[in-house]
Curated annotation (Swiss-Prot):
One Pfam family this sequence matches: Ribosomal_L21e
Domain of life: Archaea
Source organism per UniProt: Methanococcus aeolicus (strain ATCC BAA-1280 / DSM 17508 / OCM 812 / Nankai-3)
Gene Ontology BP term (one): translation
HAMAP family: Ribosomal_eL21 (MF_00369)
Record's GO cellular component terms: ribonucleoprotein complex; ribosome
PANTHER family from the UniProt entry: 60S RIBOSOMAL PROTEIN L21 (PTHR20981)
Name of protein: Large ribosomal subunit protein eL21
Family, similarity comment: Belongs to the eukaryotic ribosomal protein eL21 family.
Residue ranges crossing the lipid bilayer per the database entry: none
Keywords tagged on the record: Ribonucleoprotein, Ribosomal protein
Lineage summary: Archaea, Methanobacteriati, Methanobacteriota, Methanomada group, Methanococci
Length: 97
């Protein structure tokens, strides 16, 4: 059988919520604002498909460099390259440093 090559392929465990975390996110997470230069973690929320970056960026840490509508532009290192991803605040967590 031919292997699927969709956007979410190979994410059976990566995009799975724990049983106690199932359901929709808190509304405050969607209204969260970040400052330019702030460090954030990219943690994908599988219950929100809009504004979700590619699953290979799940768990990466980056810097906010701008805003585009209700989404944020995050600069993330991918190997030796620096990439800009666009993500909604539901998929971003503030870094505690």
């Amino acid at each position: 059988m031919q292997k699927s090559e969709g956007f979410r392929s190979g994410t059976r465990y990566k995009l799975k919520k724990h049983p106690r975390a199932k359901g929709l996110y808190p509304i405050t997470r969607a209204l969260k604002q970040f400052e330019n230069g702030q460090t954030v973690h990219v943690i994908l929320d599988p219950s929100v498909q809009k504004g979700m970056p590619h699953p290979k960026f799940h768990g990466k840490t980056g810097k906010i460099i701008g805003q585009r509508g209700s989404s944020f532009i995050v600069e993330v290192k991918d190997g030796h390259a620096t990439k800009e991803i666009i993500a909604r605040p539901q998929h971003l967590r503030e870094c505690k440093n």
